[in-house]
Amino acid sequence: SRQPHMQTSGRRQRHRRRSRRLRRRRRLFGIVVVLILAAGMAGIFLWKRSHTAGSPPTSENKGGSKDTKKKDAQSGTSDYTIELQGDSEVTVRLGDPYEDAGAVVKDRQGNRTDISVSLEEYDLNTAGEHQLVYKATDPKGKEISAQRTVTVTPNKEYGAKGLPICMYHYVYDANSVPENLNSNYIEVGTLEEELKYLHENDYYFPTWKEVREYLDGERILPDKSIVLSFDDGPLYIELAIPLFEKYQTPATSFVITSYYNDKSMLDPYRNNQYLTLESHTDNMHRGGGTYGHGGIFPALSKEEALADLKKSIEYCGNGDALAYPFGDYTAECEQTVEEAGFLCAVTTEPGKCYPGDDPYALTRVRMLGSQSLDQFISEIN
């Protein structure tokens, strides 16, 4: 009675073993299929990649544009270099002649070539470091360059021609002659002749900062340089302002700022591109002193004078230059002006300015209302 049961149990065991073997075979087959598919995809990817890399250029990129060719030719490192002749760093005094030693192009073996080298335009008329740039183009169209450093040191003894700072006062119309007409008044037609002459003869009008650099031996100004200054304020030169604009001629108006109740009253003048407002002090253009013409400036304490000057700077919107009231000043006045932050101060003493002159005691060329154009030209040249 136990034998049939044992036979049934054996069949079941054999069936389970066959099922396990079958499952293992299926899993193994699945793994093999996945590996084959992965290998096939990798092969396709590599084939496409190699085919693309080795394919000839299409009609779109076969020739390329001229600009692209030029850019490709100029990219990368050239086999040629520019070699400076002489020192790569040179020092020269302002105003002294400078002769450039030049440069040549050499190939990778160090052989000199006949490739031409151009030197970019440079200006050594100011003190400081200047970079001289040399350029050339190699046979493949690549641009190569080199630089030489030229340091210009200050020099006050280079033989400057002299800078005229012209001193004008009042401008009037011949149809409305002032009752107190004197040599400080110039007729608007006479002034226009002078401005027209300056414009047509390409005169240069330096800023006060450039004037200071000129005095310190740090800048060479063009031979035809001039500064136009008008004392006492813009109210006295209303007729001149349109002429400054017409002939594109910059001018300075030295303003007595106490004449204006509010600094906004100076806005129309301050915003004019051809008119610069500078200080003629706030309230020191009056008597009360015992020095020179009796101006009050030399008689005031340093604190009082400084407060006055700082107020005038606030009103003018500039503090580069000062005109001494009545031309009166002392060494103490100069120190106060410098402490207030001014770059320059002008007097009424006659003459042109030269490098090395005291920046706080500058001479001026007086402009007379009776002068002819020829006299004007003679005075400034």
Which role does the model predict for each range below?
Residues 1-69, 337:
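Gram-positive cell-envelope targeting signals
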Residues 196-204, 245-249, 314-317, 338-343, ...:
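Sec-exported extracytoplasmic/periplasmic mature domains
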Residues 58-63, 69-72, 131, 147-225, ...:
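N-terminal pre-catalytic segment of deacetylase/amide-hydrolase enzymes
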Residues 67, 72-110:
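Solvent-exposed, low-complexity, repeat-rich "mucin-like" stalks and linkers
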Residues 134, 223-225, 330-346:
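Short, electropositive alpha-helical surface patch
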Residues 161-185, 222-226, 234-236, 240, ...:
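Metal-dependent polysaccharide deacetylase catalytic core of the NodB/CE4 family, i.e.
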Residues 110-148:
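Serine/threonine-rich, repeat-prone extracellular segments and beta-strand-based repeat modules
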Residues 230-235, 239, 342-351:
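Acidic, His- and aromatic-enriched active-site or binding-groove loops in soluble protein domains
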